[in-house]
């Protein structure tokens, strides 16, 4: 580095910890040397968040949050705004890809035991991020003012009316009116624009917490507690390598593959057969005509299936609402439900592995059932898979403590 650059960097470092931040979070942040395919999804989640924020701001420049103009403004963006169709499809495709990446990232956490000590708070921040993501997606779902988005929002907002005593007042407060209207659209647009920046702040906290406790790995072994000394530093973990350049370059390979898939979907199949963009949403909202079948967007369908699986009690859908929210909130207590002496799925016994497999099948099945029209048979299946979903968590203290585990090596494996 030239003397001039060194002098400029020194001037900055005296006023802002630029070099220290670079060292602490990149060049001298030591990550386990055995990170595999599953480690890609953290960086891909950041990438998709950036895509959503940038494209969302661009769309907001031409979108009209007005019940009489919203649908037309989306069509205007698609037809008359330069590259508007591309930005709109980037945003709609990015929303689904964001959830795909996050679901895989959370599954990685289950496989590696990334919710266990000392990462309980890291996991809980991640669950808060997931909740804010769902809220952001829900508020944004109404904005195109299409037929399915209108009636989907109507169904979800009506769930607040199921809350005893205050339900009716609560649903009116959420809508800002007695029905989904211009007032609802305005407040949903405001929240949809604001929440991604809150999400970015939570992601920052998530990364700070991660770098404080250190990255987990497929073996679930804490490299900070192992032997010290490697080719870069005598004080660094022996099984760690600098995040930069090793994992930044590796993540770039993942980004290239991801963007290739992203681009294929965006250019050749942006609706994904109605999963990413539903056909009724290409029709303007009609409050006087209810669609034959109302279903939320695919990343909400597991919880929607749980809602429909619970029969009403005294004419109220409140028990289903409780089950739906409990299915998400139970993730907060996961770190204290797992009593296994080992973290990683590699060394857990067959009972835990079978339980996790059944849990994954149940979640995917519920996602599919949530899209299907209601029927007695589908309701029965939803009830079975809902029970299996909750059994995974509620029975975990028992089967995780009884299961036979494999011996864990002292150092990470290659």
Curated annotation (Swiss-Prot):
Cofactor(s) for this UniProt protein: heme b
Annotated localization: Cell membrane
GO molecular function: metal ion binding; ubiquinol-cytochrome-c reductase activity
UniProt GO BP: respiratory electron transport chain
Gene3D superfamilies assigned: Cytochrome Bc1 Complex, Chain C
Cystine bridges: none
Bilayer topology annotation: Multi-pass membrane protein
Signal peptide: none
Broad class of the protein's primary localization: membrane
Keyword line: Cell membrane, Electron transport, Heme, Iron, Membrane, Metal-binding, Respiratory chain, Transmembrane, Transmembrane helix, Transport
Cellular component per GO, a single term: respiratory chain complex III
Cofactor info, note text: Binds 2 heme b groups non-covalently.
Residues that, per the record, bind heme b b562: 91, 192
Domain of life: Bacteria
Binding site for heme b b566: 105, 206
Transmembrane residue ranges: 40-60, 84-104, 121-141, 154-174, 188-208, 252-272, 294-314, 317-337, 351-371, 378-398
Assembly and binders: The main subunits of complex b-c1 are: cytochrome b, cytochrome c1 and the Rieske protein.
Protein family membership: Belongs to the cytochrome b family.
Miscellaneous section: Heme 1 (or BL or b562) is low-potential and absorbs at about 562 nm, and heme 2 (or BH or b566) is high-potential and absorbs at about 566 nm.
Function: Component of the ubiquinol-cytochrome c reductase complex (complex III or cytochrome b-c1 complex), which is a respiratory chain that generates an electrochemical potential coupled to ATP synthesis.
Name by which UniProt lists this protein: Cytochrome b
Protein species of origin: Allochromatium vinosum (strain ATCC 17899 / DSM 180 / NBRC 103801 / NCIMB 10441 / D) (Chromatium vinosum)
């Amino acid at each position: 580095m030239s003397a001039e650059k060194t002098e400029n960097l020194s001037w900055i470092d005296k006023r802002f910890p630029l070099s220290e931040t670079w060292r602490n979070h990149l060049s001298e942040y030591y990550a386990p040397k055995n990170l595999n395919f599953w480690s890609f999804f953290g960086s891909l989640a950041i990438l998709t968040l950036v895509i959503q924020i940038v494209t969302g701001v661009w769309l907001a420049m031409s979108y009209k949050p007005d019940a009489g103009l919203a649908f037309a403004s989306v069509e205007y963006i698609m037809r008359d705004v330069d590259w508007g169709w591309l930005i709109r499809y980037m945003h709609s495709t990015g929303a689904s890809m964001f959830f795909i990446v996050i679901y895989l990232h959370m599954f990685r956490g289950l496989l590696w035991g990334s919710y266990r000590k000392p990462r309980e708070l890291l996991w809980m921040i991640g669950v808060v991020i997931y909740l804010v993501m769902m809220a952001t997606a829900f508020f944004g779902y109404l904005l195109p003012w299409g037929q399915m988005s209108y009636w989907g929002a109507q169904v979800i907002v009506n769930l607040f009316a199921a809350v005893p005593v205050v339900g009716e007042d609560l649903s009116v407060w959420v809508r800002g009116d007695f029905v989904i209207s211009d007032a609802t659209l305005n407040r949903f647009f405001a929240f949809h624009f604001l929440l991604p920046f809150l999400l970015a702040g939570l992601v920052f906290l998530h990364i700070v917490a991660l770098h404080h406790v250190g990255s987990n790995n497929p073996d679930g072994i804490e490299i900070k507690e192992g032997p010290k000394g490697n080719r870069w530093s005598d004080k660094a973990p022996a099984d760690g390598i600098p995040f930069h350049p090793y994992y930044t370059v590796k993540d770039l390979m993942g980004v290239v593959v991801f963007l290739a898939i992203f681009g294929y979907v965006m250019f050749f199949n942006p609706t994904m057969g109605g999963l990413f963009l539903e056909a009724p949403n290409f029709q303007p909202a009609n409050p006087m005509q209810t669609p034959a079948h109302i279903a939320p967007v695919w990343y909400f369908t597991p919880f929607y299936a749980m809602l429909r699986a619970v029969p009403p009690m005294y004419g109220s859908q409140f028990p289903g609402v409780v089950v739906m929210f409990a299915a998400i909130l139970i993730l907060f207590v996961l770190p204290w439900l797992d009593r296994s002496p080992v973290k990683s799925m590699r060394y857990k016994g067959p009972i835990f592995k079978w339980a996790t497999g059944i849990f994954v099948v149940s979640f995917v099945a519920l996602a599919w059932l949530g899209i299907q029209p209601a029927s007695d048979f589908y309701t029965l299946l939803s009830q079975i898979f809902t029970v299996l979903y909750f059994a995974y968590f509620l029975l975990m203290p028992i089967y995780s403590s009884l299961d036979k585990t494999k011996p864990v090596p002292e150092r990470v494996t290659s």
